[in-house]
């Protein structure tokens, strides 16, 4: 699988004040061409900054309509209280995650696609709130992914506390 951060959190507001930069379509197209050459899955990832999951996912609709393209969302850079991305660890609520699930499920139904994979990157408990309210639908397979930093002991204990005990559907 190829992983591409299609919307990248930024330390400055940018013209739209959203503290994120959407990558040019030609770059995403290049990744899709590479994937086509090796029959690979593609994960487009979003870091919302001051934007929303809903807005960023909608901007990727033409890619997410493809059967081999899936979605990753990164709460680390979701700044709900106006902070600069990277100044602290951000958070997604179950509503944010459900926005992605609803969008992907509708695409799957509308385009008769195989289920989409939604990867939620998480390495602290506060990065996801209300995990028990995250929807489980047949069109979307939700993976809570522990992608933290630090030594092996820290990573293992973090996985046990926040991913294993709050799995939603699948863990990674």
Language model segments and positions:
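Chitinase-like catalytic core of GlcNAc-active glycosidases
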Residues: 1-41, 50-66, 70-72, 79, ...
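Hydrophobic faces of well-ordered beta-strands that scaffold small-molecule active sites
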Residues: 2-4, 42-46, 67-75, 116-120, ...
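Acidic-and-aromatic substrate-binding clefts and catalytic sites of carbohydrate-active enzymes
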Residues: 20-22, 48-55, 123-128, 150-152
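Catalytic metal-binding/acid-base residues of hydrolase active sites
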Residues: 76-78, 124
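Outer-membrane beta-barrel translocator/channel fold
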Residues: 78-89
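Surface-exposed substrate-engagement region within the catalytic domains
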Residues: 87-172
